[in-house]
Amino acid sequence: MTGIEQKTPVGGSETGGADGLYAVLPLRDIVVFPHMIVPLFVGREKSIRALEEVMGVDKQILLATQKNAADDDPAPDAIYEIGTIANVLQLLKLPDGTVKVLVEGTARAKISKFTDREDYHEAYAAALQEPEEDAVEIEALARSVVPDFENYVKLNKKISPEVVGAASQIDDYSKLADTVASHLAIKIPEKQEMLSVLSVRERLEKALSFMEAEISVLQVEKRIRSRVKRQMEKTQREYYLNEQMKAIQKELGDSEDGRDEVAEIEERITKTKLSKEAREKALAELKKLRSMSPMSAEATVVRNYLDWLLSIPWGKKSKVKQDLNFAQEVLDAEHFGLGKVKERIVEYLAVQARSTKIKGPILCLVGPPGVGKTSLARSIAKATGREYVRMSLGGVRDEAEIRGHRRTYIGSMPGKVIQSMKKAKKSNPLFLLDEIDKMGQDFRGDPSSAMLEVLDPEQNATFMDHYLEVEYDLSNVMFVTTANTMNIPVPLLDRMEIIRIAGYTEDEKLEIAKRHLLPKAIKDHALQPKEFSVTEDALRNVIRHYTREAGVRSLEREVMTLARKAVTEILKTKKKSVKITDKNLSDYLGVEKFRFGQIDGEDQVGVVTGLAWTEVGGELLTIEGVMMPGKGRMTVTGNLRDVMKESISAAASYVRSRAIDFGIEPPLFDKRDIHVHVPEGATPKDGPSAGIAMVTAIVSVLTGIPVRKDIAMTGEVTLRGRVLPIGGLKEKLLATLRGGIKKVLIPEENAKDLAEIPDNVKNNLEIVPVSRVGEVLKHALVRQPEPIEWTEQENPTAVPPVEDEAGASLAH
């Protein structure tokens, strides 16, 4: 092979002559700059031959980077035309056939033409000369490049720190620019571009620009790495400490599951849709729990608290059914009658279907025992698709029963409201508050006052239980309360929508017995319908002669008695079936307990049938009066309370003021004592609604005119003889019907209430509205008293005082 021609090596001011002929070593993924000493590993045959060729002559070779690193035998046009002339300092052949070579770049060169040589690449190239430039400007740039390069090397851990010391000692600015460029972490095309630039100033500017941009990125990377490292160290430290704690607890015999329980609670907190306040509270308690021994008493308290907090429903709602026809079917199937209540529920569902913003209604079902208040609430839950929970308030005296105990007390728990919500598992159940009128009050607080927050739609969205100490939303709950009387604190009563449920009529009871009570008795006693039957007449007789109530509880007990006796008879006598009729009814239930429709056989003087309202419905009230020789005293007995005593006084005063109109001689009041008795004596009685009955009894006694036996009456009387309205009309009319009385006198102002009375009640009674006592006496007495003429005496007699059982006087 011929020797390699070359130009005189170029420095800063050297100029090139004609092209020299050089062996070319194509480089992959590296650009060699002048003044750089670089080790290279050579494995391709052509490249090894090129090295062997130059080692035998002047050891100069042209290093040019190929454009595609994956090309094993690059064509001339696949090699960059700007390269570096380098001296081969050392060549070492390795056992695997590759060659390690140490080269030193001397000058830039531009390839003009490749030869046709086949065994290795060979090309003509001319060394490139750097232009003359302003030395002051270049020195200024160099002063900026060196400190930036130091900073860059500190941030980029891939570059050896010794390079910085070497770079700071370089006086040749061209060499400085090439040294910095060779160590920059830039792509091959960008490095090749730096190699192609002859101007030292431009090379320094490019290096400075790149380093400033890269330093910003490296600083961010450093911060990220530091943060990640700190986080990893913290995680590793916590893991290490937790493992140590587990090992210590295991040695001490503590539960191995203590930490697992904490992890489980943390997972539950993450999954539960807690309010912001509740989540902060839960995380704070969990943090405390982590620092405690699992076996400590305080840890148990915290665990119990977190369990309660996470067990109640947060945002979990049942889908409320809005099918009005379905709701009506459910209510009708499970309860007979009760039209007003059903109508109100269907109205609520209709509004709910249009607007989801409406608050749940708070209904209060008021009525006597056994009319189906509690079971109706269960049916409402079924009709609306809500979960059903019940809380009995009967006998509750402690406010903590509602709001819970504070956690400072040993064994503290949330109140019954939160406990019931946990049981419901949904945040919009139907919540039945049973017997709300039976709540008590003592030194521990007033639970009815605590209920004010629960039953106020404006407040219960932020209900605060003393145990939980976080607000809980009850605004989606549909509250239904039940009561026997309206004896409820006024603020609490004001928050509820009152729906009165009066007693059932005889026909309604008969239907309830046939549809519900009889099938239930057959099922509960494991009977077949063909084995046990009760005729309609028998059921009616049970209602009339064995029960006297507004509801159907006693009726249910009697039907159950029939079923029990039927089972006993079938098993004893091997009968195939038992049929109860009105003929054999007494064989199973014994003698009749109540009279029905058996009023007094004859009209009597001084005996009047009044009407009363009690907690268990309406009742007939017999009022008896007698007259005897005496000194004008009036005695009242029968366990009467103040209002009824005053009503008797008003009646007596009215009769005395109108004595001559009733045919009574005024001196008679001074010569006779009158005794009014209201059986039964053991039952307390109160209220003004027996006023007209008292007037009728006193007039009958003083005139001797009998009172009709088939008439009952109710109404308050004034001293002027007006009849005032009363309450509980439906219950009183039902009692009249049960008692077999056909005619009833009611105040005229109560006539408007007849619209709510069932038609079968109105059709079976002659209801007469009255406004004055004269009208009452016209209907009640067998004949009308005839007025008399009387001249006022000189010494008018005083109105006799009214005496109770003890003989104490009561002023009129």
Swiss-Prot record:
Enzyme class: hydrolase
Entry's Gene Ontology BP terms: cellular response to heat; protein quality control for misfolded or incompletely synthesized proteins
NCBIfam families: lon, PRK10787.1
Protein name, per record: Lon protease
GO cellular component entries: cytoplasm
Gene label: lon
Keyword terms, alphabetized: ATP-binding, Cytoplasm, Hydrolase, Nucleotide-binding, Protease, Serine protease, Stress response
Location of this chain's protein in the cell: Cytoplasm
Organism expressing this protein natively: Brucella abortus (strain 2308)
